[in-house]
Amino acid sequence: MSEIVNMVASTQVTESIDLYEVSDTLNIDYEAEQFPGMVYRVADPKVCILLFRSGKAVVTGAKSKEAVEKGLSIMVEDLTNHGFEMWPLKTEDISLENIVVTYNHGDLLDLSTLSLHMQFDKTEYEPEVFPGLIYRIDEPKSVCLVFSSGKCVITGCKSEEEAQEATDHLVDQLNTMPTFGF
C-alpha cells in the first residue's frame, strides 16, 4: 500500500508583499540574506508555506490536496486580518508541483539482480554511491528509489492519480521479479 508523505504546491496569493512588514506584524523570523522567502508555519494541518515578496506561495509538507488548500486559506486569512492585501484563494490556481509517495513491497529485494532485470536505460544501481536502485518511469514521469528492505520512494508526480499510476507501474515491475530471503 502506498502513502503520500509530501506534496509541494504553489500559487500566487498577491501581486507583491513586503516580507519585512509581514515579519514585524506577525513576529515571524525573516532573514533575506539567508533565504529570499519567509517560512510561514501552520500547525493544523502541519504544513510550511514559503512566501516570497513576489506574492508567490509554495506549500510543503502537506499530505493531501485538502491540507494544501486549508494551509493556504489559513495564511491568506491571517495576512488579510492583519491588513495585507491578498487575492481570493482559488483552488484552480493552485498548482501541484511534486508528490512524494512511499511504498513497502513487503519482501527483501536483491537490487543487483533487480537492476539486471529492469529496463537498462531506466535503471541506475551503484551501491558504492547510493544504497538504493534508481528507476525512472517515463509515463507518468517520475523517479522511484527502491531499497533492499523492499521500501520504495516515488517522486516527481504532479497529481494523486499520477502517483497511483507510478506506484502501480513499480509494483508490476517488482512483482515480476523473484523475491529473496537474506
Task: Describe the function of each predicted region.
Residues 1-143, 149-151, 157-182:
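Intrinsically disordered, low-complexity polar/charged tails and linkers
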